[in-house]
Amino acid sequence: MPRIELVIGDITAEHVDAIVNAANSSLLGGGGVDGAIHRAGGPSILAECRELRATTLPDGLPVGEAVATGAGRLHARWVVHTVGPVWPGPGAEADARRELLRGAYRTSLGLAARLGAASVALPAVSAGVYGWPADDAAAVALATAEETDAAPGT
């Protein structure tokens, strides 16, 4: 049975097969975990992201989708970049956005599985500058990881 472990720390120091990056749609780096992954991983990650933008993602990566690059100098094989939604505040729209957040986790975990990753480090997607409450983002991540693990073919 797969193991889920909560780690509070620097995701760039994790020794895993895949690190999920809470990216922005431009894929060109930014603040928070996105900037930390680009800095720690080195210029090859940005070069691959630029290539993706020039070839297959000219309009950027849509919310809830995921794409993989190499991991550069990180202790991983891949970086799985995903874009989460911006927190709209409590209310009906939050429920719809929560589905987008689930989608970001689901597509990231699915892509990591297709790549052959046996271990994946997930950040609290959307919890930084996108304003999502960290405890809710973590709960969505955990629930989605458990659902994904239980789904056939994952």
Please describe what each predicted stretch is.
Residues 86-154:
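Phosphate/ribose-phosphate-bearing ligand recognition and processing surfaces
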